[in-house]
Curated annotation (Swiss-Prot):
Pfam families: EF-hand_5 (PF13202). This chain binds calcium. GO terms for cellular component: cytoplasm; myofibril; myosin complex. One of its GO terms (molecular function) is calcium ion binding. The modification Phosphoserine is found at S22, S23. The modification N-acetylalanine is found at A2. This is Myosin regulatory light chain 2, atrial isoform. Ca(2+) binds at D45, N47, D49, D56. GO terms for biological process: cardiac muscle tissue development; heart contraction. Myosin is a hexamer of 2 heavy chains and 4 light chains. Residues 32-67, 102-137, 138-173 form the EF-hand domain. It comes from Sus scrofa (Pig).
Length: 175
């Protein structure tokens, strides 16, 4: 009996600790980001029960054109939540993955590699070539779509600080 109570107490303590850890999750994001996560959660929660389950994941993958997702992959995704994945857990999982990263600073650092003079611009043609040929290659159509929103000077240089703002905050300027 004593060992049973001890086991119960540690479960309760673990639950309290998990709740304390996740209670701060909403302060990690701006309200607009939370709303976007809520929309993503709603898209995944196919049966609208407030919990993401295996059938929700399978149906979401199916809608994205991936029909033969291995059971192990779905199980691994669900195990990250260490229990039922409601919206708070969903947000916590993203918070843990994004914690300590400043996407804007990471993007600026990457652009600075291509701006040895430190002028805040990169050459459009050189950048286009990188996008088409390196790492996760962009299609020509994707590159043109991106350049449609990209701030450039008359010489065809990309203002990467403004582009970084667009990437991390959207193309609408706050007033």
């Amino acid at each position: 009996m004593a060992s049973r109570k001890a086991g119960t107490r540690s479960k309760a303590a673990a639950t309290k600790q998990a709740q304390r850890g996740s209670s701060n999750v909403f302060s990690m994001f701006e309200q607009a980001q939370i709303q976007e996560f809520k929309e993503a959660f709603s898209c995944i929660d196919q049966n609208r029960d407030g919990i993401i389950c295996k059938s929700d994941l399978r149906e979401t993958y199916s809608q994205l054109g991936k029909v033969n997702v291995p059971e192990e992959e779905l199980d691994a995704m669900l195990q990250e939540g260490k229990g039922p994945i409601n919206f708070t857990v969903f947000l916590t999982l993203f918070g843990e993955k994004l914690n300590g990263t400043d996407p804007e600073e990471a993007i600026l650092s990457a652009f600075r590699l291509f701006d040895p003079s430190g002028k805040g611009v990169v050459n459009k043609d050189q950048f286009k070539q990188l996008l088409l040929t390196q790492a996760d290659k962009f299609s020509p159509a994707e590159v043109e779509q991106m350049f449609a929103l990209t701030p450039m000077d008359l010489a065809g240089n990309i203002d990467y600080k403004s582009l970084c703002y667009i990437i991390t905050h959207g193309d609408e300027k706050e007033e």
